[in-house]
Amino acid sequence: MRTRLIGNKLFAMTLVVLFVILASTIAGQAAEWKPTKPIQFVVPYAPGGGSDVLARSMIAAIGSEKLCPVPFVVVNQGGGSGLIGTTTAAQAKGNDHMLLTFISGQVAAALAAKGAPTFRDLTLLAGLAIDEELIVVKTDSPFKTIEDVVKAAKQRPGTITIGGTATGQEDQMCNRLFERAADLKFRYVPFNSGGECITAVLGGHVEMIWANPSEFVPQWEAKMVRPIVVAKEKRMTELPDVPTFKEKGNNVTFEMFRGVGAPPGISPEVAAFYENMLKRMAQSAAWNTGYLKKYMLSPTWRGSKEFTQFVAQNEPVFKGILTELGLIK
C-alpha cells in the first residue's frame, strides 16, 4: 500500500514537472516572435516635421541598441491631416511588419472626418514623450514678444497670419485656445508638416507659426527663428527666456503626445515584441540624449494599455475644441 502511494505521488509530481516544462516552452516560443523582414514605419506627415523626426530618431536609437533584427523603412504619407497614413495602417490588418507614428493630431483628425479610422482601429503600442507647442517667428520679425502679437491682432483682427501643421490638429487647436483666452482672431494657414511651416515663416509667407522644438531647433540654433511663448504650465528648462502664456495673462496650455501604433489584428506576441522593444529603447542613452534632450521633449513612458486609456481620455477634450472651430458639426 505504501509503495503504491509513493508511486502515485511520484507519478503526480512527474506530471506537474512535465506541465511546467511544457508551459514554459510554450510561453518561451510565444515570446520569441521576431520580425523577419524590413518594417515599414509609416509617418502620416511630410518629411521634416515632428513625426518624421520622431520616426527617424527612434530608428537610430533602436539600431544603436541593436533591439531589432531587421531594418526599418520610413514611408512618409502626408496629407489629409494625417489621415492618409493612419488609414494605411488601419487597413493593414494583421500586418506584423508595420509601425505608425501616432500623435494627438491624428486623434483630432479622425474626430473631424466622418468615417475616418480612429485610434480604436489601431493597436496602440506606447506613448513615448510629451512635446511642447510654441509660437515661433523669424529672427527679424517685428514681433519681439507675445504682447506685440496681441496688440497687432487687436488692431488687425483676422488678418495676422499664423501657420501650423494641418487643419484641426494640435497647432490649430492651440491657436483656438489662444484666440479664446485673449479674445483675438488670426488667419490660420495649414501646411503638411512642421518642416513646411518653418520654410513658410522663413520665406515670409506667414508672420508666425506654431511649432514644436523638434521642428525648429536647427533654425533656432542658427539664429534664423525665435520662439516667443510656450503653451506650458511652467517655462521650459531648455528655453528659460521664453515665457508661458499663463505668465502673460492667457490660460493656454497644451500637452502634445507622441507615440507609436501598429495595424489592428496583430497577435499578442507581436504586440509584446514591439512594446518591449520600445520600452528598452526609451531607457537608452541614445534615445534620451539623441532625441528627448536634443529636441526638448519630456519623457513619458506609457505602455500599450495605459497609452490607449490616455488617448481615450483626451478625445472628448479635442472634440470640444474642434466643435468651437466648426470642424465638427
Ranges and model annotations:
Residues 1-12:
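N-terminal secretory signal peptides that target proteins for export/translocation
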Residues 36, 180, 184, 266-329:
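An extracytoplasmic/periplasmic, membrane-proximal ligand-sensing/linker region
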